[in-house]
UniProtKB/Swiss-Prot annotation:
Catalytic activity: tRNA(Phe) + L-phenylalanine + ATP = L-phenylalanyl-tRNA(Phe) + AMP + diphosphate + H(+)
Subunit structure: Tetramer of two alpha and two beta subunits.
EC code(s) of this entry: 6.1.1.20
Key words, A-Z: Aminoacyl-tRNA synthetase, ATP-binding, Cytoplasm, Ligase, Magnesium, Metal-binding, Nucleotide-binding, Protein biosynthesis
An example Gene Ontology molecular-function term: RNA binding
Protein name from the UniProt record: Phenylalanine--tRNA ligase beta subunit
Principal subcellular localization: cytoplasm
One annotated Gene Ontology cellular component of this protein: phenylalanine-tRNA ligase complex
CDD domains: PheRS_beta_core
Gene3D superfamilies: 3.30.56.10, Bira Bifunctional Protein, Domain 2 (3.30.930.10), Phenylalanyl-trna Synthetase, Chain B, domain 3 (3.50.40.10)
Gene that this sequence comes from: pheT
InterPro entries associated with the record: aa-tRNA-synth_II/BPL/LPL (IPR045864), B3/B4_tRNA-bd (IPR005146), DNA-bd_dom_put_sf (IPR009061), Phe-tRNA-ligase_IIc_bsu (IPR045060), Phe-tRNA-synth_IIc_bsu_arc_euk (IPR004531), Phe-tRNA_synthase-like_B3/B4 (IPR020825), Phe_tRNA_ligase_beta2_arc (IPR022918), PheRS_beta_core (IPR041616)
Family designation: Belongs to the phenylalanyl-tRNA synthetase beta subunit family. Type 2 subfamily.
Amino acid sequence: MPTINLNKWILQDMTGLNEQELVDYLFKLKSEVSPVSQDEYSIEVNADRLDMLSLGGIVRALKGITGKELGEPSYPVKDTDYVLEVEKVASRPYALACVIYNVKLSPDFYLKELIQFQEKLHDTIGRRRKKVAIGIHDLEKVEGKIIRYAPVSLSTTFIPLNQEREMSVRDVLQETPQGKQYGNISVWDSNSPAIMDERGILSVPPVINSDRTKITGNTKSLLIDVTGTNFESVMETMDLLATALAELGGIIGRVKVRGMSVDRSPVLRHTSVPFSLDDVNKRLGIHVSRDEAINLIRMMRMEVETNKDLAVIVPPYRVDIMNYTDVAEDIAMAYGYDRFTLESGRTASRGSLSEKSEIYRKLRTLLVGAGFQEVYTLVLTKSSYQRGEAVNIANPISVEYDSVRNSLLWNSLVFLSNNQHSRFPVRIFEIGDVVNRDDSKDTKYSNSTRLSMAIMDSRVSYEMLQAPLHEVLLNLLGVAPSYRRFESDIFMKGRSAEVVVKGETIGRLGEANPELLRSFGLLYPVLLAELDLDALRRVM
């Protein structure tokens, strides 16, 4: 859950609430408050409420839930003569911009809070800047009215934020902390995206801004650019920023856009979500009237179409409202979860195992029948045990648990190493999740369920493990697996194979490499197998 820090005195002054009232009302909004210092709160915000990652959003929500202000606020919006020209940028094709006048960035808390909001949006909807990146500039330092978004050569120079010398884009990507962290996201064919005015580069998204347009406590007007790989996310991010600043007294200035599917930015999109009041009452187990429901929705800072059928008018900042289920949840929050009463269940039903659980249960039964004993090991392990790329913990409590396992084999070897005194042969198996690199995911990693099998004995041969594995799969699938030659540093050369079912590779097995065994302190030979159970289920 994202967490933000806010000045307690400013928050209390803007909402008219004391500390206990803030705690109580924010809890009703699924947020938890804890003091950081005498002057600061830490607020843990529910992950879907991106609008509440800012001071303006928190204030707007609290004014609604307390009934001090109802419905969507009317923010001042005016058209400007600024123009954003969007050229073709293959790696990051979407861009929008807006102007905010009459901003308040002094005292320093307001500036700090704006930067915090920017980074929270980067980490959430922006997927660590891969999907969306935000640039915030002092408008008075921008040259001209034409803003361009276009590719630039890596040899193009500018002075990056908080630097004193001019650097090429290439040097920025290679030498600055931001460049090293985000530089590889959008570079293509020796080009990088850039936001530019008449004088030169304003920012190199998603990496860094120019020092020339750096915002300070004296900044009165802002130019905001949002770029990304998904237009919907770019548009929502811009709307969130504009409305949060408007809540604090800013005036939204719309920028003309050329080269995008919209001609003005911010879009400030409104959508309509119809809902049935009878259905909401049934879902929640309450009985609110039509007028009560309308009032509750307006407490959540939204408006309602009051024709024959009701529909919520979703404002630009409520990007979490997608269907009538979300509407029902908002009605429940405004109504108050503390007002719900407990009722005994009126019907009795019997649960059943999912298809996946049935398969794993049968697999366990077959493996136990084959003479193997199930073990359970922790998902966290020691990074020195792992082979290949793995997810490491940034601040581990213990070096023994500083990495997320990328295979079940390493924990099996640790288990065997700790049980070399046991009666031979030792036959074990484990079913559990692992985490591996997956570039197709936004997070770059994905979970998968694996089965590991291991046999330790004074003497072993490949067939000692291949035979029971073959029988288990034959009984489980009704189809005999086949085996294909496979080489890996994990196994001895010529004594390993891939397990293939219906043409798809589902695992590997073989005699463990003696060097691998020595690294785990094992004195006896070991047979290892690991199957991808997600792949196994696909071929069933």
